[in-house]
Regions:
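A short linear hydrophobic-aromatic micro-motif
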Residues: 63, 162-166, 198-204
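Alpha-helical scaffolding segments of alpha/beta enzyme cores, especially the outer helices
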Residues: 24-31, 35, 147, 151, ...
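Active-site phosphate-binding strand-loop segment of PLP-dependent enzymes
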Residues: 1-45, 49
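PLP-dependent enzyme catalytic core of the Aspartate aminotransferase-like
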Residues: 185, 191-236
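Active-site PLP attachment segment
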Residues: 58-102
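Structural signature of PLP-dependent enzymes
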Residues: 108-154
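Conserved PLP-binding catalytic core of the aspartate aminotransferase-like
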Residues: 146-153, 157-196
Length: 236
């Protein structure tokens, strides 16, 4: 808070961080931005489909989210939410036919259909939502994913020999956990895991500390986690 003064106009933060897999207290952060007269912009790439996203309740100025990650929508689908006071102030870098149309919502008119973009993945989002609801995603599937990742968490932590990133359970997203890597050269870790063990694991080396992230989806099982652990033992 000591770093924020009147010169700060925009505060941006993730709902769930990609590298460290931390679930942020976004309502508190939005209120913090408001109290300092700053615009709040939330990177919600990993949130929709993993945690409840109530845009009215969050009340941020802007929220950008993906549907093709945890919502299981076709690749390349996402959304931009803008509070009503910003709707008619957002201009796309490439204008669409809506630029010359009359109407009150410029956000939709100017961003809705641009060039030759294939909108069929967007039209499939409704089916994704219906699929999640029909399969009781938030009440049954996600809790099972959390149970699976928590069951193996201590074992993975033991393989790394590093401390946990999670001092408070409130910061743990339901289906993601990140782990610190010990000191050393991990530049080949991702490729070796993928090519030699057929394990896809994001490895983040662009920070002072190095991380890898484990994500669990409905199709993962105990066998997958055991194979992951054996691969980590081999390459870390």
């Amino acid at each position: 808070e000591s770093l924020i003064d009147s010169s700060v106009k925009v505060i941006t933060f993730p709902h769930i961080s990609a590298a460290t897999a931390q679930l942020f207290p976004i309502k508190d952060l939005v209120n913090f931005a408001k109290s300092h007269g700053a615009i709040s912009v939330i990177d919600g790439a990993h949130a929709p489909g993993q945690v409840n996203v109530n845009l009215q309740d969050i009340d941020a100025d802007f929220y950008v989210g993906n549907c093709h990650k945890w919502m299981l929508s076709p690749k390349g689908v996402g959304f931009i939410y803008a509070a009503r006071k910003w709707e008619n102030k957002i201009r796309p870098p490439a204008i669409s036919w809506g630029n010359i149309s009359s109407g009150t919502n410029r956000l939709l008119l100017e961003n809705d259909w641009q060039g030759t973009t294939d909108i069929s993945p967007i039209l499939a989002v409704e089916d994704s939502i219906n699929f999640l609801e029909e399969n009781h995603w938030f009440s049954q599937v996600i809790p099972e994913c959390t149970k699976l990742i928590d069951e193996f968490y201590s074992t993975i932590l033991g393989v790394t020999g590093m401390k946990s990133l999670y001092e408070k359970n409130d910061f743990e997203p339901p289906q993601m956990r990140s782990f610190l890597l010990p000191e050393g050269d991990h530049s080949t870790l991702h490729n070796r895991l993928f090519h030699e063990s057929k394990v896809e694991l994001p490895v983040f080396l662009d920070f002072e500390d190095h991380f890898f992230r484990v994500s669990v989806q409905a199709y993962n099982n105990h066998s997958d986690m055991e194979r992951l652990i054996e691969a980590l033992k081999k390459f870390i």
